[in-house]
Amino acid sequence: MQNITRLFDFPYYQLEKYNLKVALATKYKENWITTSTQEYIDKANAISRALLRLGVKTNDKIAIISMSNRTEWNIMDIGVLQLGAQNVPIYPTICEDDYAYILNHSEATYCFVSCDEVYQKVKAIQDQVPTLKDVYSFDEVPNCKNWSEVLALGEDITNQNDVENLKNAVKPGDLATLIYTSGTTGRPKGVMLSHANLVSNALESFKRIPIELGNSKSLSFLPVCHVYERMLIYLYQYCGTSIYFAPIDQISEYAKEVKPHVMTAVPRLLEKVYDKIIAKGTDLTGLKKKLFFWAVALGLQYEPYGQNGWWYEKKLGLARKLIFSKWRDALGGNLSVMASGSAALQPRLARVFNAAQFGVMEGYGLTETSPVVSVNDMRNGGFRIGTVGKPIDKTEVKIAEDGEICIKGPQVMLGYYKDPEKTAEVLIDGYFHTGDIGEIDADGFLKITDRKKEMFKTSGGKYVAPQLLENRLKQSRFIDQVMVIGESEKMPAALIQPDFDFIKNWAKIHKIEVGTNEELVVHEKVIARIAEEVEEANENFAKWEKVKAFRLTPEVWSIDEGHLTPTMKLKRKIVKEKYLKLYNEIYEHV
């Protein structure tokens, strides 16, 4: 059996053990095109042979930029890695300036794009990147070479021996990829991950995912340029799981069709799913509506392992049969695991989705740790709501004196590319300093409390952890995004982006004329209603932590407008700059 020590070993292992008819599947113009394990390997080898003919050498960097997950990305990935070259995945939504920076910083020699939209962005800065020899597109794009030309160039197998020799020369500790973190401040940093980093993380994370080997389907929609989904793609290959790719804005339609057993999620997505479900429940009438909200209330009290007693479990069984089964059917009916990561998951969502048997398991990790550090697992008592589970095997988690979480293990990055100073700041005595604050309970479960860098002191000298407040405020259906402010000021306050759709619906029911978004955010009744939500959230916090004032913003906070990173994290500095007038109003700065 193929021993897995390098990333390109995964498909060969899958071929020996499972030889799937459907290893990868992508929908093109309403038709599913499936790729077997054998085809996957054959095409990856064709890419390797072609890249050699195009002059690609060991340690060259090949950039891949795709608007959505698709089969071609994975074929390219293996084709590049087999040569000892590195795959540099780039978020499609970043600005042209960042494209130029990453392509130059990595010295990318070729760039593969998914479609015309991405091609136009690359084309606009191509002359600023002297190392870039050519650009190829997966879709047919006018005046752009197509990746099918590369596949055709690789049809001649006479240089396959050269590919095999290069493959054999790749060591587990060699650099596999540069992943540029979507920094909340400053330029992106290139995280250097080795084959061993990602292989170990996939193999250790696999132990936490209850999945039927060789006979299950996954739905992949989180960006594969992010290390979280990328590592899981390797894990799925190891499990013999068929991977179906879906656009992120059509998850429910694809899930109904594919009927996946496993998928990944981020809290923001789960929040939106929950809000949609509640909105549908609100539209019900009579007994149906009563039953629906009875089930939701029951779900919000959920504790695993029958901790609520037999009477609760009996009611839960009934709720699952009458209500929650319909929720499951909306995502295909087979879903048993949803791994949630990238940001803090509200405990109420963990409760209600697990009551509904979605198997939402929260984990914790960073790009620099390939990414998984810890994850919950329903089996063997390994699940505790409000925590990110226990550390995976071979991983040591240490809490520093100031509460910072420090990690040692085979998944810790090699360092930041071309940046020994920043590397030295975070890698100290073999431990990676995460910048997150947390604690480990008596049973070994890790709990994250805040970002070290995001905590601030008020002018009264009191520490405030903004994420805790933000997560509580976002439980309100009136609030879509929020940023807690107050560093060196007399009190904490908040900049709030209301949930415009929900508020307009609420206003209609209450016969309130709210007008445009600009008018809505200054409407007395809207402000008064959101003030009630803020007051309710404040009840959970100490006097000095409470949000004492807020302002509503008229724009929807987005990645494109610069409010958020591609992983939906707040760019605090930019949000503050955008709404400096509102900030100054709150604190009465002239």
Predicted regions and their residues:
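Conserved AMP-binding A3 loop
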Residues: 34-38, 176-202
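Conserved ATP-binding/catalytic segment of the ANL
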Residues: 391-458, 475
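Conserved C-terminal "lid"/linker of ANL adenylate-forming enzymes
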Residues: 456, 481-484, 531-590
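Conserved ANL (AMP-binding/adenylate-forming) active-site segment centered on the GW(Y/F)…HTG consensus within
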Residues: 314, 381, 385, 412-435, ...
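Conserved AMP-binding/adenylation subdomain of ANL enzymes
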Residues: 199-220, 224-324, 334
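Conserved AMP-binding/adenylate-forming core of the ANL superfamily
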Residues: 24-55, 60-71, 76-78, 95-100, ...
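Conserved pre-ATP/AMP-binding loop-to-beta segment of ANL
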Residues: 20-22, 137, 155-180, 187, ...
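Structural core segment of the AMP-binding/adenylate-forming
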Residues: 82-153, 529
